[in-house]
UniProtKB/Swiss-Prot annotation:
Signal peptide boundaries: none
Cofactor requirement: Mg(2+)
Record keywords, A-Z: GTP-binding, Hydrolase, Nucleotide-binding
Protein name as it appears in the record: Ras-like GTPase HI_1637
Lineage: Bacteria, Pseudomonadati, Pseudomonadota, Gammaproteobacteria, Pasteurellales
Short motif Walker A motif, span: 27-34
Record's catalysed reaction(s): GTP + H2O = GDP + phosphate + H(+)
List of residues binding GTP: S29, G32, K33, T34, A35, W98, S101, T102, R103, K342, D344, H345, V384
Length: 470
């Protein structure tokens, strides 16, 4: 008991004096969270060797405020350590490889030793140490957070809105099984498992079609819950409001309706809420990553799917200004950065368009954030740069292009991907074929001792960390 109280007191003191910064790196599946965290760690550790030469926009590195950076033991010993070394080893292979996708939660802690340049504490303590806690987790789990505000009926009705177009075609099998289910009958475990598997298969098919709004997220990446009854439910999108009310009044406790409701509530209250409280309710700063380019290359529905997923994230984080007392007793996010990833997949002149598009995508969900006095920033980056900018001569004209090793066939190619729309694409954009010539690229070879090549990670570090070294 005493140790727990002492630990909480130490956390409050450290938070109040800015000794600890908890960074939430959030984003939908395939947005590049693991690459972002790996590069962020690498850029900070590289300050020990390369000083500021690779991070010219990061003032604390440029002016010598940061004295040393090292990885240290994390506080929560029950969470796996982020496998930075393995990721770095993948980039050092010949040929280099991309990292394994995230399968569960992991954590890392960096100790950043620095010399204060300003502020009251420079008189009290010449040097300080900032502990930076960073978490990685599957993007699939992130989109379960909106369930915290929805009961089973509300969630089912939300799914009606998205089961259209391509999704409606993919859903035919599980919908036909659902239509034939008597929700008032006594529940059979085998029948529930069979329909839940059909619904899970549907979610996997949506993901394969480029959709990113996948709920429940654990259905496609269950981790240690695979096969558990907690993952064997599905939305009742065929019920009218009147039918819902009738079943709530008349369905017995052992009926399909009651069992499905109970499982949804368990999933929301135990699994999703536990995940949120353990990892998301106490963050100080947040980065929201979005791959805007892949949906542009895919379909209008994939793009709208991504936009809807991002806009649903904002309801589950506490934004607002942070003074000394706030930091002590009410942790909340005070700096928020929206980051468009894979900026190395387009030519340099298209990056302003990509940033503008990112603004457009999040505008509706993020508008209230700006009104609460929180610092917000929009940028485009490549956490791991895979291409180089080149000029090609075509029919006597010089054209900007990119060059890199294409993932699908490992061939070195040079191409102009096209124009990135600066605003939300209209119907005419999707009628063009192709909408956008977007390829995936392999990482560049990483030599021993070199820092990971990047695009604008120093701007990210400047926005997220600079005030802690003043």
């Amino acid at each position: 008991m005493f140790n727990r109280v002492q630990k909480e007191i130490n956390q409050i003191i450290n938070r109040g004096f800015d000794r600890t910064l908890r960074l939430a790196v959030t984003g939908l599946s395939r947005s590049g969270k693991t690459a972002f965290i790996t590069s962020l760690i690498n850029q900070l550790l590289s300050i020990n060797q390369h000083s500021s030469q690779n991070l010219p926009l990061f003032e604390a590195a440029r002016n010598g405020s940061i004295l040393a950076v090292k990885r240290v033991s994390q506080q929560d010993l029950s969470v796996p350590r982020f496998d930075y070394e393995s990721n770095l080893n993948d980039l050092s292979q010949n040929p280099p490889q991309w990292f394994q996708s995230t399968r569960g939660v992991s954590e890392t802690r960096l100790a950043i030793r620095f010399q204060r340049q300003s502020g009251l504490l420079r008189h009290l303590k010449e040097r300080g140490t900032l502990y930076l806690d960073i978490f990685d987790y599957p993007g699939e789990w992130l989109l379960d957070l909106p369930l915290l505000n929805l009961d089973f009926q509300q969630w089912s009705q939300e799914q009606i809105k998205v089961t259209t177009g391509v999704r409606a075609e993919l859903a035919q099998n599980w919908l036909s099984m659902l239509q034939n289910l008597d929700l008032s009958a006594v529940a059979n475990e085998d029948v529930l498992a069979k329909i839940a598997k059909s619904y899970t298969d549907y979610l996997h098919q949506c993901k394969a079609q480029g959709m990113q709004f996948i709920q429940p997220g654990r259905f496609v990446l269950p981790s240690d819950l695979e096969g558990a009854p907690a993952l064997q439910f599905f939305p009742l999108i065929h019920l009218s409001g009147e039918h819902w009310q009738t079943l709530k009044k008349t369905a017995k406790s052992n009926s399909y309706f009651a069992v499905l409701t109970k499982r949804y509530n368990y999933y929301r209250n135990k699994i999703v809420k536990g995940f949120y409280e353990n990892y998301f309710s106490t963050f100080d700063r947040q980065v929201i990553l979005a791959d805007c380019l892949t949906p542009l290359n895919h379909s209008q529905q994939a793009f709208l799917d991504m936009q809807m997923g991002l806009n649903q994230l904002f309801n589950n984080f506490h934004y607002g200004s942070r003074n000394f007392l706030h930091r002590l007793f009410s942790p909340q996010i005070d700096r928020l950065m929206f980051v468009a990833t894979k900026a190395d997949h387009i030519t340099r002149d298209q990056i302003p368009n990509l940033v503008s598009l990112m603004r457009q995508i999040v505008q509706e969900g993020g508008r209230h954030v700006e009104f609460e006095g929180i610092d917000t920033e929009y940028t485009a980056i490549a956490a791991v740069r895979t291409t180089k900018q080149v000029i090609v001569n075509q029919q006597g004209k010089e054209i900007k292009a990119i060059q890199g090793v294409r993932s699908i066939d490992k061939q070195l190619i040079t191409l102009y991907p096209g124009t990135v729309p600066s605003k939300l694409p209209k119907t005419e954009f999707w009628q063009k074929q192709p909408h956008f010539d977007f390829d995936s690229f392999e990482p560049q070879p990483l030599e021993q001792g070199e820092s990971i090549p990047h695009l604008r990670m120093d701007a990210v570090l400047q926005f997220l960390l600079s005030d802690r070294f003043e």
